[in-house]
């Protein structure tokens, strides 16, 4: 099986063309391939498939390193867009794709930076999903013998966002796993730790559901900005600094889609016997 290794700001992917190759991935095989010592090693596996809908260009599936399938990955979407152009599967600069539960339009710029229309952030608890009587800008959660304040939003996948004073001292390893599996998030959750530098600039670390802390999380950056805007902390256009690099997010507000722009790097092509 042929594959490519790619990354978006250090969030790394094994990308497989299932348009021209016949492939099947069991959770056990994915876990084996994800192992950084004995396999290929990656945060997520991206599988490019023919479109399920004739109005779209492709469908793509996203699997975490633990073998679980997820519905959204912002960094993965950017790598996906570059992959299908590099491999000659399309020459379009505007690419329409579906994922497990959403549709997106991806634009590949002249500089190979990719802008992803991530759709409108969803704050309604039932759509995240999050157990709450009604939507609030801030929720109080009891976790790891602490009381924390957080925002909750779906960007096609569930996110919990905490504001912290200093990102370097955030309790990512303590609060990340505890919040990820908190009982009020029935499908588990990605946890963002956001430091507001100014209204147009944040620093962010993300503990990803099924993957742990990563170098960058595109949907996590989108979620943090959406929550920050909803809470009145941020402006419409925000620079997000992650450990792996910088993303630019724009969200005019409710009723409009959120746009994420950032790089996607092709590292190497490989072949593996399954």
Curated annotation (Swiss-Prot):
Task: Specify the pathway.
Answer: Amino-acid biosynthesis; L-lysine biosynthesis via DAP pathway; DL-2,6-diaminopimelate from LL-2,6-diaminopimelate: step 1/1
Gene3D superfamilies named in the record? Diaminopimelate Epimerase, Chain A, domain 1 (3.10.310.10)
Reactions it catalyzes:
(2S,6S)-2,6-diaminopimelate = meso-2,6-diaminopimelate
Indicate the annotated site residue(s) for Could be important to modulate the pK values of the two catalytic cysteine residues: 159, 208
Q: Which GO cellular component terms, listed alphabetically, does the Swiss-Prot or TrEMBL entry include?
A: cytosol
User: Care to name a GO molecular-function term for this sequence?
Assistant: diaminopimelate epimerase activity
Q: Which UniProt keywords apply?
A: Amino-acid biosynthesis, Cytoplasm, Isomerase, Lysine biosynthesis
Where is this gene product found? Cytoplasm
Query: What Enzyme Commission number does this protein have?
Result: 5.1.1.7
For binding substrate, which residues are annotated in this chain's numbering?
Answer: 11, 44, 64, 74-75, 157, 190, 208-209, 218-219
Which GO BP terms sit in this record?
Answer: lysine biosynthetic process via diaminopimelate
Q: Give the annotated active site.
A: 73 (proton donor), 217 (proton acceptor)
Q: What is this protein's function per UniProt? A: Catalyzes the stereoinversion of LL-2,6-diaminopimelate (L,L-DAP) to meso-diaminopimelate (meso-DAP), a precursor of L-lysine and an essential component of the bacterial peptidoglycan.
User: Record's HAMAP family?
Assistant: DAP_epimerase (MF_00197)
**What is the protein name for this chain?**
Diaminopimelate epimerase
Upper lineage ranks? Bacteria, Pseudomonadati, Pseudomonadota, Gammaproteobacteria, Enterobacterales
Q: Gene symbol? A: dapF
């Amino acid at each position: 099986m042929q594959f490519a290794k790619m990354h978006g700001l250090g969030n790394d992917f094994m990308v497989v063309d299932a348009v021209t190759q016949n492939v099947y991935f069991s959770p056990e095989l994915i876990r084996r391939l994800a192992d950084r010592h004995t396999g290929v090693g990656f945060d997520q596996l991206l599988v490019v498939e023919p479109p399920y809908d004739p109005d779209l260009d492709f469908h793509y599936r996203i699997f975490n390193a633990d073998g679980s399938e997820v519905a959204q990955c912002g960094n993965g979407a950017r790598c996906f867009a570059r992959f299908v152009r590099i491999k000659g599967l399309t020459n379009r600069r505007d690419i329409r794709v579906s994922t497990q539960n959403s549709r997106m339009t991806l634009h590949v710029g002249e500089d190979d930076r990719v802008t992803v229309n991530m759709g409108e952030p969803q704050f309604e608890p039932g759509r995240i999903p999050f157990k709450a009587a009604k939507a609030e800008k801030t929720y109080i959660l009891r976790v790891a013998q602490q009381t924390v304040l957080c925002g909750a939003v779906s960007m096609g996948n569930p996110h919990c966002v905490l504001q912290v004073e200093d990102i370097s001292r955030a309790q990512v390893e303590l609060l990340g796993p505890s919040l990820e599996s908190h009982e009020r998030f029935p499908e588990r959750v990605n946890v963002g730790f956001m430091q507001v530098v100014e209204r147009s600039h944040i620093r962010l670390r993300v503990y990803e559901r099924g993957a742990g802390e990563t170098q960058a999380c595109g949907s996590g950056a989108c979620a943090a900005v959406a929550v920050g805007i909803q809470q009145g902390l941020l402006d419409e256009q925000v620079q997000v600094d992650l450990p792996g690099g910088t993303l630019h997010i724009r969200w005019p507000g409710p009723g409009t889609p959120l746009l994420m722009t950032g790089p996607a790097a092709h590292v190497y092509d490989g072949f593996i016997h399954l």
